[in-house]
Amino acid sequence: MVAPGVYRSGHPNERNFGFLKRLNLKSIIYLANDDYRENVVQWANREGIRIFHHRVTMNKEPFTEMDEDEVASALTHILDERHLPVLIHCNKGKYRVGCVVGCIRRLQRWSHISLLEEYARFAGEKMSDEEFIERFDLSRVKLDPVHCPSWL
């Protein structure tokens, strides 16, 4: 759990559906360029779960970086209590999710050291992601003060 009502994982599969159902998810945030797996789409539709697909590439030195507009849009969805509980995932649940969670931690005013330690627990050290988290412009995230979670 990232925060109350916010969960992170790798790509869900049929073995996970029973557990995910118990989370009473309202939405899923998928952070990847790949098309979403049809079996997960069908399951989410049956469960009434809304899928937000943000086409986010991984940070790869020296020239490929995550699209800040996509990350800001994903954060806007995650930080709207009308979408909670929410599952955030990419393929492995490490790098892209780690960057988004790192940005959430900055919005929560975590220390830089603490958020990097959390990132490293899930993904190890990756300089390009650490730099992305540090320099991401938080003002790009459009927070709705009426629907912002109380833990933010």
Please annotate each region the language model reported.
Residues M1-I88, K92, C99-L152:
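Cys-dependent protein tyrosine phosphatase-like superfamily
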